[in-house]
Design a protein with these regions (language model features):
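N-terminal hydrophobic signal/anchor transmembrane helix of membrane proteins
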Residues: 145-167, 251-262
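Short, solvent-exposed loop/turn and secondary-structure capping segments
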Residues: 156-159, 181, 237
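Contiguous, well-ordered alpha-helical segments that form the cores/surfaces of helical PPI scaffolds
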Residues: 88-92, 138-150, 196-208, 224
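Short catalytic/ligand-binding loop motif for oxyanion handling, primarily in non-cytosolic enzymes
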Residues: 154-155, 197-198, 404
Length: 654
């Protein structure tokens, strides 16, 4: 199945999943694993849910694999990380297929696992799983809400609460989570995987929640997530800035979870594997609003999207999310500001006894105390994981996309935050990082995330990325460029510039410090492609361009045949154009924008005009003009209008 494959009809997508499974799926319990394997790991039950949905529609499929359901139950019973990812499928199986496609013995096993599960941190039992990141929160809250609703009079043995009490407990957490997302968007911004996990937590609620406003609000939050995909995708992929990123998604876009969802909803994307989220959207009959579908159409000209998500801890009280109120602590844990000076007192209360997070929080607490006693200054927002206020700039044309998190936490240690990406389509993605490891499974690592976050800014088709790495990081005093030459139709190097063309899209990259091409690394291909790595490795050219030095400037300028004429004309435009100065005081003579100035502590100016890079609206694009923390989002595209009124819990689609 190639990247050009497009699917919109729900049953058609489910049939496609089943056809893939006929080739890829295990047929015996011995072939199953505990890994994140779409068909054969603990999430393989989504393949069997797809079969149940088709059988319900009168379409023949291979037999249901009860052993795949058992694999999910094993993870739930052991309370392992990501067990919550399996529960949406189990709830739908019980609600829609019990007594027909789900036999009674299997249904009772599912019930017992769900009734004995640990649904939140305040319940007894060791914590072996992550409950508290933004996506895990909604998965746990929706699971507790719906399972409690299904079994109101049953006593759940783990903490002795009845199902009705669990439902009430979850409702308070759920309503807070919904309110935060409606007002501030998603801290894990534009994630290729976690957006789908958010939808996974919301999709059953939009059908089964016993409170009408929650059903509507969950549907509208799915709409909002889908709108983010609509205005930021390129050819059905999401090569943008990201709040959290993984190597396999940015290097190999066909692995993106979001691509199958866009294939299902937009007739865009890649449907060569199974997406749990897409299966659930198809099974629950989610219909994308007309205006969002129109906005998702490929741009015929230049489209610019500015948007803002999340808030800084220092601003939270202004927005009514007081860090001193323990009821708000999960907002800050969702954006991963566990150890901020304003949150740390309440963070200590989350795990009063030892947990893997306890060491980190207690260590920072002691640091604050010692510095205060000594009267010494101290960084009050130290979390390398933090996903605070982000101002996103994305430019899309028919031939390329360029996207940036404007001046995001410059100089701070990073985690999985991905400040910028350019793409000419498919695997022809371009970005830089300050690596934190030569391994590919660490966070951050060689390509996913940054040891030190840069100061990156974008204006239209030009991006400037400044790195200043602390001297203490002696092994990683460099930055490097991912530029897959084998994915380009042409690559030319001259006068310090690296030029690439794919189709009618062009890219130019310049490093202020001299660089060199590093030999391709077989370890990366083994990490990404498993059995087929050798074939991919043999086809690849060198892709890593390294610039040694703790302080460097990268300049990226995009173009196209429509904007610049021929590729030769695009390259000729850079003749004699200089990049002068350093990370503190930079002057770039852009062929398209004229003189651009910038620096580590200087504003961005273009043609002498200071460019705003902070304080964006919630949405600022041709389809939506929405102030930050507004109560509603109005989207107009293709003669259609969608209004997501969160304050009234009303959804309009005309």
């Amino acid at each position: 199945v190639g990247s050009e494959m497009c699917i919109r009809d729900s049953l058609k997508y489910l049939e496609h999943v089943v056809e893939l499974g006929k080739v890829q799926a295990a047929t015996t319990p011995e072939e199953m694993s505990g890994a994140f394997d779409a068909f054969n790991g603990f999430l393989g039950l989504y393949y069997d849910l797809a079969k149940m949905e088709l059988q319900k529609a009168g379409i023949d499929t291979p037999p249901i694999r009860n052993f795949a359901i058992d694999k999910a139950l094993e993870r739930i019973d052991a309370r392992l990380d990501c067990a919550d990812f399996t529960i949406p499928a189990l709830i739908r199986m019980l609600r829609e297929h019990r007594g027909t496609r789900l036999n009674e013995e299997q249904a009772q096993k599912i019930e017992q696992s769900l009734i004995h599960f640990k649904y939140w941190l305040d319940e007894p039992g060791d914590v072996h799983a992550c409950f508290f990141t933004e996506n895990h929160q909604i998965l746990y809250h929706s699971a507790e809400y719906l399972v409690g609703q299904m079994y109101p009079d049953v006593v759940f043995p783990n903490n002795g609460m009845t199902g009705a009490e669990h439902h009430a407990h979850a409702t308070a957490f759920l309503r807070r989570w919904l309110n935060w997302r409606e007002r501030f968007g998603f801290s894990e911004w534009l994630t290729q995987g976690y957006y789908m996990d958010d939808m996974l937590g919301l999709v059953n609620l939009m059908i089964y929640a016993d409170e009408a406003d929650i059903r509507t609000r969950c549907r509208m939050l799915i709409d909002m997530l889908v709108f983010d995909l609509a205005v930021n995708h390129f050819e059905g992929h999401l090569p943008t800035t990201h709040g959290r990123v993984y190597t396999r998604f940015i290097i190999e876009p066909d692995y993106e979870d979001c691509s199958a969802v866009m294939a299902l909803l937009f007739d865009k994307g890649y449907a060569g594997t199974m997406s749990n989220c897409a299966v659930m959207l198809a099974a629950n009959g989610y219909v994308c609003p007309k205006a969002i579908l129109a906005a998702a159409a490929a741009p015929t000209g230049i489209q610019t999207n500015r948007e803002r998500m999340s808030i800084d801890v220092a601003d939270a009280k202004y927005y009514g999310v007081d860090p001193a109120d323990f009821d708000n602590i999960m907002f800050f844990w969702g954006q991963q500001t566990y150890s901020d000076r304003l949150t740390i007192e309440n963070s200590l209360k989350v795990f009063p006894t030892w947990n893997w997070m306890t060491n980190r929080v207690r260590a920072y607490y002691e640091r604050y105390k010692l510095h205060d006693e000594a009267g010494a200054p101290c960084v009050d927002a130290p979390d390398f994981t933090a996903m605070t206020q982000v101002d996103i700039y994305t430019r899309r044309t028919p031939d390329y996309i360029l996207s940036c998190a404007q001046d995001f936490r410059k100089g701070r240690m990073g985690y999985q935050q991905h400040p910028w990406t350019a793409s000419l389509g498919g695997k022809a993605v371009i970005f830089t990082t300050n690596p934190a490891s030569t391994e590919y499974s660490n966070r951050p690592n060689c390509w996913a995330g940054n040891l030190t976050l840069p100061r990156a800014v974008q204006h239209e088709n030009v991006l400037l990325c400044l790195y200043r790495v602390e001297p203490d990081f002696v092994d990683y005093l460099y930055s490097h460029l991912y530029f897959p030459r084998h994915e380009m139709d042409e690559v030319v190097e001259k006068e310090g510039w690296i030029f690439g063309r794919k189709g009618d899209g062009y890219a130019a990259v310049y490093s202020l410090l001299p660089g060199y091409w590093e030999k391709k690394d077989p370890a990366m291909f083994k990490e990404l492609y498993a059995e087929s790595w050798q074939e991919k490795y043999d086809r690849a050219d060198d892709y890593e361009y390294i610039a040694q030095g703790h302080a460097n400037v990268w300049v990226i300028e995009m173009g196209s045949k429509a904007e610049n004429g021929s590729f030769e004309a695009f390259m000729d435009g850079f003749a004699g154009k200089k990049v002068c100065g350093d990370t503190h005081n930079l002057i770039y003579q852009s062929p398209s924008q004229g003189e651009i100035t910038f620096g580590w502590n200087r504003p961005l100016t273009v043609g002498g005009e200071t460019i705003c890079i902070h304080g964006y609206k919630r949405y600022d694009n041709e389809f939506a003009q929405t102030e930050f923390d507004a109560g509603a989002i109005e989207i107009n595209a293709g003669g259609h209008q969608t209004i997501l009124d969160f304050e009234k819990a009303e959804r309009t689609d005309i």
